[in-house]
Amino acid sequence: MKMRIILPVLLALALTAAALVSFALKADGAAGVIVDAEAWARATPPGATTGAVYVTIANRGGAADRLLSVKSPAAGSAMLHETIEESGVSKMRETDGGIAPGAALEMKPGGAHIMLIGLTGPLKEGDTISVTLDFEKAGDMTVDAKVAGIGADGPVD
């Protein structure tokens, strides 16, 4: 009699455990994107309408992910840009934001960056601005970027 009760209970527990492990593996593959370094921005001169934010994003999951959009209350719009050189001239262009599993997207001056367009006010040294990154699989992630001085090469210490 006890065996008739114990076997179905053990079977139910085993199936539940298997389902949880499967869910955990899927979650790891889909939401493995993390911010790997401190987000920072450069201060802007008076009257500037654009600014830049830099951060390193690592994909620690098992599937590729892509940064779909960026938004910030500090600007009317924001997008992921990269700096390229064509015929000896540096130009910026929008980029797709794809991050392969195990790879990282390192944003830094002269390279990839988040371009803030239509600033709502100047980016002042010492301030902090909020930036929301929307990933295809990992969803939304909000980071706070500390504003460094004009011409800074890295985050505020």
Where are these regions (language model features)?
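Positively charged n-region of N-terminal signal peptides that target proteins for export
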Residues: M1-I5
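Bacterial N-terminal signal peptides
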Residues: L10-S22
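Compact, glycine-rich, soluble single-domain proteins
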Residues: L25-D157
